[in-house]
Amino acid sequence: KELLQSRSAADADSIIHFKGDDIEIAFTYTDKCGEECYSFVNGWETRNGGTHLEAFRESFVQVIYEFIPSKNIRRSDIFNGFAGAISIWVEKPVFVEQMRYELGSTTMTSYPDSISINDFVVCFVKNRLCSLLKQNSWVRNMILERVIALAQERKRLRPLDE
C-alpha cells in the first residue's frame, strides 16, 4: 500500500489492500495512462514480473469479466490507469536470471504436491476481489464504471484511427 502511495501518488483512501498468508496485494486507479505493476518475491522486487504477476493480472481480468460480461471490454480497458502490487512468499524461489528480476518458480514449495503459484494467486485474488465487489457497491461502481467508460471512449475514438 505504501509503495503505491509513493510511486503512483495515489490517495491512501483509494488503495485497495488484501493480505493473506504468504501473499499481499494492493491496487488502485490513477489519472495516468497505461499500467503500473510492481511485484515482489520474498522481499525481492521482480521488475520483470513472473508467474505471480501474470496470475494477478489474469485473475483480476477474470473477476471484472464476471461483473461485466460484455465482449466489448478489453484488458487495456481494465488496466488503463491501474497501479498494482503483489508480494508473495515462496519456499526456495527460482528466478529466470541471476539478477532476480523475474520469478520462474511454478509452485509455492519444493514438495511434489505443492499448490501452483498460479492457482494460489488466482484463488486468493478471485476470492478477495469478488467478495469486495459484491459487498461494497461504492468500490464496485468505481471500478466497473471506469472500465466501461474507457471501453466506450476507445470505441468512440476507433473511427478516427481508420
Language model segments and positions:
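GHKL-family ATPase ATP-binding module
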Residues: 1-162
